[in-house]
Design a protein with these regions (language model features):
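Nucleotide and nucleotide-moiety/phosphate-recognizing core
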Residues: 2-114, 125, 129, 134-136, ...
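Short glycine-enriched, charge-decorated loop/helix-capping segments at active-site entrances
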Residues: 111-117, 154-158
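Hydrophobic alpha-helical segments within soluble ligand-binding/sensing domains
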Residues: 120-123
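Glycine-rich anion-binding loop/nest that anchors nucleotide
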Residues: 137-145, 154
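Short, electropositive alpha-helical surface patch
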Residues: 148-164
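Conserved small/polar residues in nucleotide/adenosyl-binding loops
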Residues: 166-174
């Protein structure tokens, strides 16, 4: 896809793990970012859509109507709900943007990327396996642990000072 072919995504999908236990964890930064978008753009409350394995809301960014979707599958099975969502709405993969945590970026840093590998992220691995890789991603940095205990790090809550990703905003142009 060349820069002249890139169009604004129609669906923003936040990755995370369902349940109170994981609220506020680094791994749930995708959910959190969607909540911030919904609040900023006055979107209705997310409504559970069991047939899609997730919760859905609608918003308007700069006059563009978009869907906001939170997968209710655990991170490692995210591809199942994304596949179902794409099939249900008959979407091409390049119309979605996956929002996820990224250990390789400093906390509070965000990067937009189109296509590519999973970079060790099991949620992306699941999506790429079941759907392909030609989608947008907003990678939100959560920093890297000082130890090799990555699982406990991403499933834990960051310190208050580290939660600078709450001030990120969505670019209006890709």
């Amino acid at each position: 896809m060349t820069s002249t072919q890139i169009s604004f995504p129609k669906i923003f999908i936040g990755l995370g793990n369902p349940g109170e236990k994981y609220n506020g964890s680094r791994h749930n930064v995708g959910y959190h970012f969607l909540d911030l978008l919904a609040e900023k753009y006055k979107a209705p409350v997310f409504k559970s859509e069991s047939k899609l394995f997730g919760s859905l809301s609608k918003a308007s960014f700069e006059g563009r109507k978009v869907l906001l979707f939170k997968s209710s599958k655990y991170m490692n099975q995210s591809g199942e709900s994304i596949r179902r969502f794409i099939d249900y709405y008959k979407l091409s993969l390049d119309r979605i943007c996956i929002i996820h945590d990224d250990l390789d970026l400093d906390c509070g840093t965000a990067k937009i990327k189109f296509d590519g590998g999973h970079g060790g992220h099991n949620g992306l691995r699941s999506i790429i396996h079941l759907c392909g890789s030609a989608f947008f991603r907003i990678r939100i940095g959560v920093g890297h642990p000082q130890t090799k205990d990555v699982i406990n790090y991403v499933l834990s809550k960051p310190s208050t000072e580290a939660v600078s990703y709450t001030h990120l905003t969505l670019p209006t142009k890709a």
